[in-house]
Structures are given as structure tokens and as C-alpha cells.
Amino acid sequence: FTGEVMNDYTWDISMQWHIADYLTNDCCYLQKPEYTEAAEAFKDTGSFRGQDSLFHPDVVAYYTSSPSVTSHSQFRSLEYTIGGPLKMIPDTDFVAGVQSAEYNYENIYDKQSEVGNVGGSSGNSSANSRDYTALFFESKTSLLDGAGELSVAVRSDDYSDFGKNTSWTVKGLYDVMDGLTLRASVGTGFRAPGLGDLAANTTFSADSHIDYVKCAAQGIARPDCPSEQVNTYIAANPNLGPETSESTNVGAIYT
């Protein structure tokens, strides 16, 4: 929805609502308890369920698994902006607004994967939600009879799961002559941690890596250093805060 106020100002109200549901199915993973049962039976008696091979299709079907993940996510937001001339400062336009949003998700793994019975797979069930409110303002001022331009922007976010953060940017342009423009900017930024990083259950994965330090200690040359699997556990950290950054850019545009 859009409109005008006092002929000089425009306003805009926008809404979003996204829902995503999907199911992921995999095939032919090793079901560890059933495989152990079959392997021990062959070791003791030489057969299992009337078959004389651990790799008979009927036996393989017994100890293989088809893990699945059921996922749901929902995002809703409402944003209101207003813009026009900032009359207290000559030759300046502005845009200001407020945004409110809510996001939630869940990834549900099958029960056998959750308890660690599926070999070679990684992942575990997780669910989380957050909401936030943001206030933002941006202005652009024409300077030096149009030869220069100054932009200022500031945004303040208030997240339900890790608190508040404010970021800002100041940019400037100056046309030195026809075809040559100098520009510079300085600012800060941030990125909120992912919901899975904050709340996912601990996940097991058998990752491959090359340990060059170990090979050097054993006198093995780097090209001959073998790859090996290690047990890896990936856990969430509910105490994560936002990633923050500072940036400065200076440059020229020549055409």
C-alpha cells in the first residue's frame, strides 16, 4: 500500500508472509544395530535369516535405513516507511521507517537418526524462533551546487534472542571534473547468528581430514599424507552474539 501526505511525502506499507514445508528422504544408509546383529550371526553360525551371505539382498534390506527430515519454516514481516524532503536541512531528502518481523523453523529428523543408529549420516532435530523490530533512517544531501553528495544511514535492531544492535554508514561523493568522481564511505555492520547455530541439537559427523602435523612427526612427506576420518560433534551455542564489522572505503570513478 502506498500514498502521499501533504503532497511532499510518500508512505508505503508492505507485508510479507512466507511458509515453506518440505520432506527430504535419503536411501541406503547403514542401520548400525541391525548390521551388528547380522554380522555377529554370520560370525557365530555362518548364516542369518536363512541366507549364507551378509550381502544377500534380503539381509542388506534388513540392516539398511532410509532416513528422513521433515522441515517447516515461517516468516512474517510488516514494514512502514515514509520519505520526502527534510526541510530542516536544505537540499536533503530522507527515508525513515520501522520493520517488525517474526521467524520460526523446525527440522525434525527420523527417530533412528536422532538416537544415532544410522551410520554415516549427520544432523539432528532442531527448532527455534525469533522476532525483531528495526528502526531505520537514511538521508541524502546535495552539496556544492550539485557537485557533491552526502548520505547518512542508521539502523537499530532489537532481537528477542540476543538483544539490540545499531549500525550506521556515512557516504560522500564529489565530482572533481567531468568524468572524475571521488568517493568515500565509513560505517559499521552486523549479522545475526542463525537460529540453528543457537539451538540445534548436537550432531555427529565422520569428517575426513589430512593431519599434516602428524605426518611430519612420522616422517611422511606432505604429498603422501593420507586422509583419515575423525569423529566430529557439532553443537549449538545459545550464547552467540552478532557478528560485527567496521569498514572504510576510498576510491575514484573515472569515465
Predicted features along the sequence, with ranges:
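Transmembrane beta-strands of outer-membrane beta-barrel proteins
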Residues: 7, 11-13, 92-96, 148-152, ...
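Residues on the lipid-exposed face of transmembrane beta-strands in outer-membrane beta-barrel proteins
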Residues: 1-3, 78-84, 135-141, 170-174, ...
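Outer-membrane beta-barrel channels and translocator barrels
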Residues: 6-8, 87-89, 144-146, 177-179, ...
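Charge-patterned, long linear interaction tracts outside catalytic cores
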Residues: 235-255
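Surface-exposed, low-complexity loop segments enriched in small/polar and acidic residues
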Residues: 2-132, 187-242
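Generic beta-strand/beta-sheet core signal
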Residues: 14-16, 97-99, 153-155, 173-175, ...
